[in-house]
Amino acid sequence: MREQHRTYLVTGVAGFIGFHLSNLLLSKGYSVVGVDSLTDYYDVTLKRSRLEILHSFARFTFFKEDIANDDFPKTLSSVNFDVVIHLAAQAGVRYSIERPREYLDSNIVGTFNLLELSVSRGVEHLLCASTSSVYGSNNNMPFGESQKCDTPMSFYAATKKANEVMAHSYSHIHGLPTTMF
């Protein structure tokens, strides 16, 4: 795929990082397919304002969709993309104690759906956001990529660690180029 014609699928496109990354990609001439469920965990009005800005680019397509839905991959059947940047997640440590099912659905099932979609579409690369919460009770500072991350202290951290392990296995089994960050 020629670099200038690359299309990025960005999940969590209306969030802070998703919006700014998509805005940068679009301003550099790339195409972006954005997905966001527009949950009310963060201000929905702000998310809609961000989407208005992204919609000013002709190369931006938006799908209001929950990546944890079984039909999510079918929603994207009309669009092509080369790279997946997976930023969507249910965030928040405290909230994960109160509502663990939402984290299971959004973070684990949603990531599984993205992994399956990436393999079935033969994407060039999958990039997935993790969190510093995966370091858990690790007291070694600063955190390093080679440190153990097997002591999550919240369900949120556990779901993000599970995402890392799932992505690693898909990379190994299916040859899916994957980067966790």
Where are these regions (language model features)?
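N-terminal Rossmann-like NAD(P)+-binding domain of SDR-like oxidoreductases, especially those catalyzing
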Residues: M1-F181
